């Protein structure tokens, strides 16, 4: 049985005081939530502060990106081992905004995936097609390329610490959401690609999250789908009550 994951990507929001206010509101709202893995991903500058606030709670800490080398002359970068040192257990890699604005490629995403896994982090590995690619019927081609490139060189054992997040780029921050059927179709395909590249056991066990305008109003329908194992939440994770509602989708 795959344990659902609800992860909040705070993106470039929340100063230290705002982040503390948010987690302090969130903690009591989700403390009794069972059967779900909860993750929040603040900006780098507040990771240690948020980690201290989360001590003894059921909420895991993630970073929004990492670099592929452990150390070196890479101005502005943060390594996986540094994230671990800051108290992170998870890291988001390959988000479409990183691909779009910062030139992430399947190759650089793969290097980051491997570095994070070997440092001991669980990765939230993001994939997804643009509106143009969907309209050109390229969705499955793009997803297979991204998965194949992203998990190249990753062992079956390491794959246990990989969570895939499917985020159709056209649904991120637009208010548009894939229908339940569209999301399930993509998730089923993704699981099939993992089976083809690895094996059926790995495919059955890997958790695949949906991301793209997930809200309290649509989470139940998405989570009712056979191959959807959770959500990577953007805007709705910036308010404690809406994120808690998503975390408690099964209640």
From Swiss-Prot:
Pathway: Carbohydrate biosynthesis; gluconeogenesis; Carbohydrate degradation; glycolysis; D-glyceraldehyde 3-phosphate from glycerone phosphate: step 1/1. It catalyses: D-glyceraldehyde 3-phosphate = dihydroxyacetone phosphate. CDD domains: TIM (cd00311). Substrate binds at residues 9-11, 173, 213, 234-235. One of its GO terms (cellular component) is cytosol. GO terms for biological process: gluconeogenesis; glyceraldehyde-3-phosphate biosynthetic process; glycerol catabolic process; glycolytic process. Its EC number is 5.3.1.1. InterPro entries: Aldolase_TIM, TIM_sf, TrioseP_Isoase_bac/euk, Triosephosphate_isomerase, Triosephosphate_isomerase_AS. GO terms for molecular function: triose-phosphate isomerase activity. Keywords: Cytoplasm, Gluconeogenesis, Glycolysis, Isomerase. It is found in: Cytoplasm. The active site is at residues 95, 167. Involved in the gluconeogenesis. Catalyzes stereospecifically the conversion of dihydroxyacetone phosphate (DHAP) to D-glyceraldehyde-3-phosphate (G3P). Homodimer. Belongs to the triosephosphate isomerase family. This is Triosephosphate isomerase. The gene is tpiA.
């Amino acid at each position: 049985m795959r344990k659902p994951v609800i992860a909040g990507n705070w993106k470039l929001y929340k100063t230290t005081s705002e982040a503390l206010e948010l987690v302090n509101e969130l903690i009591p709202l989700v403390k009794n939530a069972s059967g779900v893995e909860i993750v929040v991903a603040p900006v780098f500058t507040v990771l240690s502060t948020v980690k201290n606030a989360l001590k003894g709670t059921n909420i895991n800490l993630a970073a929004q990106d990492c670099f592929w080398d452990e150390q070196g002359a890479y101005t502005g970068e943060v390594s996986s081992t540094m994230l671990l040192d800051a108290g992170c257990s998870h890291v988001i890699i390959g988000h479409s905004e990183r691909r779009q604005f910062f030139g992430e490629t399947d190759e650089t995403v793969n290097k980051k995936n491997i570095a994070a896994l070997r440092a001991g982090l669980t990765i939230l590995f993001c994939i997804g097609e643009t509106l143009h690619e969907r309209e050109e019927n390229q969705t499955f081609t793009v997803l297979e390329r991204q998965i194949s490139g992203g998990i190249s060189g990753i062992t079956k054992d390491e794959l246990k610490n990989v969570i895939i997040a499917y985020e159709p780029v056209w649904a991120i921050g637009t208010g548009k959401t894939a229908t339940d059927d569209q999301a399930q179709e993509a998730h089923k395909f993704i699981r099939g690609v993992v089976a083809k590249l690895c094996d059926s056991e790995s495919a059955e066990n890997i958790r695949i999250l949906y991301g793209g305008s997930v809200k309290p109003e649509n989470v139940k329908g998405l989570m009712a789908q056979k191959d959807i194992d959770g959500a990577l939440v953007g805007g709705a994770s910036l308010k404690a009550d809406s994120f808690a509602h998503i975390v408690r989708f099964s209640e």
